[in-house]
From Swiss-Prot:
Keyword set includes Transmembrane helix: no
Protein name (Swiss-Prot/TrEMBL): Ethylene-responsive transcription factor 9
Molecular function in Gene Ontology: DNA-binding transcription factor activity; transcription cis-regulatory region binding
Higher taxonomy: Eukaryota, Viridiplantae, Streptophyta, Embryophyta, Tracheophyta
Organism expressing this protein natively: Arabidopsis thaliana (Mouse-ear cress)
SUPFAM superfamilies cross-referenced by the UniProt entry: DNA-binding domain (SSF54171)
Length: 200
């Protein structure tokens, strides 16, 4: 008999000899992120509600749940500022993690390695198309503010250092050439007439 699923567990039922034998194995449960939905074909969609317009803002479709969660976090900080509920802390932010033991007063404070750094290591040159969203440009869910362009460029050069020297291209504008332009023949595109005869 085929396996069935019940409450996140896989149950295999086999009938043999005198009765039924049931084997239960726990399946690995996926982590669910705020603002992220898994598509049936395996990719992850990210969206957020705009608090001002009370509408959904589409942030994009991503290969991993962590990338989609990062897009949601960036949009949440853009919309709600420091009060935003996010999936991951900002780099350098410490998080409170409960050890899960009997003593709930014990709290272990650690700095969490963010998924953004792991994504940068795996895909340092990943490029995404830009989309115009609300107040700025969104590149795969990350908003672009022209006033912060210099600091973003400095951070990008630190994270993804350029391995080649830039090349200056100079255009020679001072040279003038005479171009002979002949007038084009007028096209007669009246469909009621026979096609024009072209002289070769």
């Amino acid at each position: 008999m085929a396996p069935r699923q019940a409450n996140g567990r896989s149950i295999a039922v086999s009938e043999g000899g005198g009765g039924k034998t049931m084997t239960m194995t726990t399946m690995r449960k996926e982590v669910h992120f705020r603002g992220v939905r898994k598509r049936p074909w395996g990719r992850y969609a990210a969206e957020i509600r705009d608090p001002g317009k009370k509408t959904r803002v589409w942030l994009g479709t991503f290969d991993t749940a962590e990338e989609a969660a990062r897009a949601y976090d960036t949009a949440a900080r853009e919309f709600r500022g420091s009060k935003a509920k996010t999936n991951f802390p900002l780099p350098g932010e410490s998080t409170t993690v409960n050890d899960g033991g009997e003593n709930d007063s014990y709290v272990n404070r650690t700095t969490v390695t963010t998924a953004r750094e792991m994504t940068r290591q795996r895909f340092p040159f990943a490029c995404h198309r830009e989309r115009k969203v609300v107040g700025g440009y969104a590149s795969a869910g990350f908003f672009f503010d022209p006033s912060r362009a210099a600091s973003l460029r400095a951070e990008l050069s630190r994270v993804c250092p350029v391995r080649f020297d830039p090349v200056n291209i100079e255009l020679s504008i001072g040279i003038r050439e005479t171009v002979k332009v002949e007038p084009r023949r007028e096209l007669n595109l009246d469909l009621n007439l026979a096609p024009p005869v072209v002289d070769v």
